[in-house]
Amino acid sequence: MTTALDQLKQYTTVVADTGDFQQLAQYKPQDATTNPSLILKAVQKDAYKPILEKTVRDHRNESTDFIIDRLLIAFGTEILKLIPGRVSTEVDARLSFDTQRSIDKGRELIKLYEAAGIGRERILIKLASTWEGIRAAQVLQQEGIKCNMTLLFSLVQAAACAEAGAQLISPFVGRIYDWYKKQAGADWDEAKDGGANDPGVQSVRRIYTYYKTFGYHTEVMGASFRTTSQIIELAGCDLLTISPDLLQKLQDSNDPVERKLSPDALHDKPTERVAIDEASFRFQLNDDAMATEKLAEGIRVFAADAVKLEKLIAALR
């Protein structure tokens, strides 16, 4: 029997969402994604502490920021030894509202990868999908630095990223699901509100349809999954980035997987493009309580984990 994971790979590029790169080989993903929380989690495991310790030891007299950049590249370099495709490395979330510093950090990370002998075609720089992050991506893309727009929860963010020429977006399925489930409280009915009706799944489907309808080349990579059901409902999406625990569940399953998204079978096609000048973007984002709250929360969580990583480094100096 063909596993659900192998079936999914027929329709979608499978990406591993982890800093724990020793798990990669068994799932054979094309690409991999990391974020501050995943790197923080990894460096606290015995298997990866030596990478953190060596990076601090080699650059003991440099700034903490300098050391973190080298740590990100160390993880990215190891990951790229195990996959054929690209790795995503994230810009510090504390730069989410600073276009110029985000541009500078993106350039610096690419420079470090290239110094390690890795071509920029194998790297995606992750930026928060704020107005400022999207403007940074526009500049970086024009320089041949490909960007993965993260913390994306709404069509207006997706539309702005596509107009800016971003290589790829990461709409967060699970966090959208979490918000609506919490809002519904006791009224939430998983049988009725999950599956194809899952609000996170519907959000990605809407974005995918918008992109294909208007001919955007920005790749759509569903992210932040809570269940294999959410993944199966998005079979056919350009890419899906999946945590090792859910990759394992897909590998253990022989349930049939059918293509749910296809550029040749679009439903509920939009008739107009979303207005995305700065004022329109900010108003539409503000008008979406879920997207506003989850974007702010996501930035806070990633920023807090960056601070925790700094403290780990300080303790090793």
From Swiss-Prot:
Keywords: Cytoplasm, Pentose shunt, Schiff base, Transferase
Annotated GO CC locations: cytoplasm
Reactions that this protein is recorded to catalyse: D-sedoheptulose 7-phosphate + D-glyceraldehyde 3-phosphate = D-erythrose 4-phosphate + beta-D-fructose 6-phosphate
Keyword Cell membrane: no
Enzyme class at the top of the EC tree: transferase
PROSITE patterns: TRANSALDOLASE_1, TRANSALDOLASE_2
Pfam families referenced in this protein's UniProt entry, alphabetically: TAL_FSA
UniProt key word Transferase: yes
BP GO annotations: carbohydrate metabolic process; pentose-phosphate shunt
Active site (catalytic residues): K126 (schiff-base intermediate with substrate)
SUPFAM superfamilies registered for this protein in UniProt: Aldolase
UniProt-annotated location(s): Cytoplasm
Entry EC number(s): 2.2.1.2
Pathway the protein acts in: Carbohydrate degradation; pentose phosphate pathway; D-glyceraldehyde 3-phosphate and beta-D-fructose 6-phosphate from D-ribose 5-phosphate and D-xylulose 5-phosphate (non-oxidative stage): step 2/3
GO MF, one example: transaldolase activity
Main location: cytoplasm
Family note: Belongs to the transaldolase family. Type 1 subfamily.
Alphabetized PANTHER family for the sequence: TRANSALDOLASE
Subunit structure: Homodimer.
Function: Transaldolase is important for the balance of metabolites in the pentose-phosphate pathway.
Protein name: Transaldolase
